[in-house]
Amino acid sequence: SPPVHPPPHEKPPIVHPPPHEKPPLFEPPFEKPPPAHPPPVHPPPHEKPPIEYPPPHTKPPIEYPPPHVKPPIQYPPPHEKPPIEYPLPHEKPPVYEPPYEKPPPVHPPPHEKPPIEYSPPHEKPPVHEPPYEKPPLVHPPPHDKPPIEYHPPHEKPPIEYPPPHEKPPIEYPPPHEKPPIEYPPPHEKPPVYEPPYEKPPPVHPPPDEKPPIEYPPPLEKPPVHEPPYEKPPPAQPPPHDKPPIEYPPPHEKPPVYEPPYERSPPVHPPSHEKPPFVYPPPHEKSPMHEPPYEKAPPVHLPPHEKPPIEYAPPHEKPPVEYPPPHVKPPVEYPSPAEKPPTHEKPPIEFPPHEKPPVYEPPYEKPPSVCPPPHEKPPHHEKRSALYPPHHRKPPNHHKPLPYKKPPFYKSPPVEKPSSYESQPYGRLPVLPEK
């Protein structure tokens, strides 16, 4: 029995991935591994089993496909690839194990090297010490020289300061002379821009002359429809003709278009004159429309007389129709009045005999069933593990302690610092005192 246990532990992992293909295919290989691998499986089970199982997987599929003909040949190829991929990752883990053994020996050597590096720098500092001995020898001689140099420089600066003060005033005036020379030329240029300002004004009027040339032609067409309307207002247009004659002369060229402008003004007055002429005729025709209004009232009167004549006949008909139906209901009511007594008799006779015996038995059953469940709620006792639910809790013979009202808790006085007096959200709440 002990040697049999290891092989089954190795088989299940192999059975899980390829059970979807063909469970019976993997049964024969299960018989071969137990006798051959039991002893070596224990020490290196993780290294050898994955390497040995791929070959048996490749052989069985090659033997079984021929009997199944084509369908099995199509399914195994895609399923054969995953099993080939699984063993490869199992082979890689052992490859990573040896490199883990190498890093530990790598760490000690670097720790040995740093101490070797620190020793040489400690030897170099003493090399820098001799040059520190030389500078002190260099410093004393310069200390001897500076005192000799300080005296002459104090004598020279006063001689040097006056000349520089004389030069700056000489330099400032020339730049001041140049700006005035530059400003006049720009002043000469502005007058050059003035003449062009005189030219644009004459440019603007010509465009003003062109629009009037465009507007008159459309105005010439309406006067074609106005000839018959020019006759009635001969008195009013003459005064209106004079103002338009005054406006064109300032434009110099408009006088050429004066004739069309004379026609345009009469266009507006006649239009204003048209409404007055149009309004009177309708007022004159209003009497023509009035007669129809006079006819309308007499037309309404007769209909008012007719409706009463028309309403009367319909009112006469309904009463003639309603009485016959009303006559029938009274004939029907007496018959039902006689039937109720017949309906009342059966309920009085049958139900009283049937109901009393039916209600008696149920009333006897509830009292026997209900009392036990109703005993539990009134007690309101918590169930305990020591006593069954149908037993009462053992009585407590100790006398209950007298109830004493607890004293009211009075918080100690709060000493507010000066910073608490002005709070943005108002004063702090105060507990009530009793």
Curated annotation (Swiss-Prot):
Keywords from the named record: Nodulation, Repeat
Region (36 X 8 AA approximate repeats of P-P-P-H-E-K-P-P): 6-407
Keyword Repeat tagged: yes
Biased composition annotated in UniProt, kind: Basic residues: 389-402
GO-annotated biological processes: nodulation
InterPro entries (UniProt xref): Proline-rich_CW_protein
Bias-annotated ranges (Basic and acidic residues): 7-24, 78-94, 109-132, 141-191, 239-255, 282-293, 302-319, 340-357
Disordered: annotated segments: 1-434
Domain of life: Eukaryota
Compositionally biased region (Pro residues): 25-43, 51-77, 95-108, 192-205, 256-269, 320-339, 358-372
Similarity annotation: Belongs to the nodulin 75 family.
Job of this protein: Involved in early stages of root nodule development.
Identification of the protein by name: Early nodulin-75
Upper classification of the organism: Eukaryota, Viridiplantae, Streptophyta, Embryophyta, Tracheophyta
Gene of this entry: ENOD2
